């Protein structure tokens, strides 16, 4: 059961993809476990809010379990700070704590709290399609460039 996504992705090994992103819910259900088993890398988006830190702690425990029992190649390589509101001390404190814990894994780009980012899914659109010139869209493009500059982990057979 835990290998369904890995098996499906094996069909893409001969394709010319630089990255394959698997967007998962924050809960640890079968979809998330399948994604963690299939992937060599994890990108964690973290909201700059208090309770997000508690969720990250649980996620790291779960990643450790998957790494120990199902996918020894699994590694958190990238952390993206989201819903950042520079007007609040809390956002700065959360960002500082995340940077202290994850160090160079945290992207320099942060995604600001934005009405446009929040509205886009309601129209079944990405923020880049919904409002390409918005701060949120531009920040996501900056983050994607930063990820591309870092480069992907080498592909290991069976792990796309």
Regions found by a protein language model. Give the residues of each.
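P-loop/Walker-type NTP enzyme "switch/lid" segment
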Residues: 1-18, 70, 120-123, 127
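Charged catalytic carboxylate motif
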Residues: 4, 58, 139
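Conserved catalytic-core segment of NTP-binding enzymes
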Residues: 10-115
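Nucleotide phosphate-binding site architecture
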Residues: 112, 118, 128
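C-terminal boundary of histidine-terminating zinc-finger modules
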Residues: 121-142
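A short, amphipathic alpha-helical segment
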Residues: 141-153
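C-terminal helical "lid" subdomain and adjoining coupling/linker elements of P-loop NTPases
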Residues: 152-160
């Amino acid at each position: 059961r835990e290998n369904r996504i890995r098996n499906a992705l094996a069909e893409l090994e001969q394709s010319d993809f630089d990255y394959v992103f698997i967007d998962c819910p924050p809960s640890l259900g079968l979809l998330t476990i399948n994604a963690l088993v299939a992937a060599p890398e994890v990108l964690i988006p973290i909201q700059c809010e208090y309770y997000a830190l508690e969720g990250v702690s649980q996620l790291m425990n779960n990643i450790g379990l998957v790494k120990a029992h199902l996918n020894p190649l699994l590694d958190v390589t990238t952390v993206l700070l989201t819903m950042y509101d520079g007007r609040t001390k809390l956002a700065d404190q959360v960002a500082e704590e995340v940077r202290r814990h994850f160090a160079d894994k945290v992207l320099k780009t942060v995604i600001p709290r934005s009405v446009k980012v929040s509205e886009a899914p309601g129209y079944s659109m990405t923020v880049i399609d919904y409002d390409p010139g918005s701060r949120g869209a531009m920040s996501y493009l900056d983050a994607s460039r930063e990820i591309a500059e870092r480069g992907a982990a080498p592909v290991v057979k069976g792990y796309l």
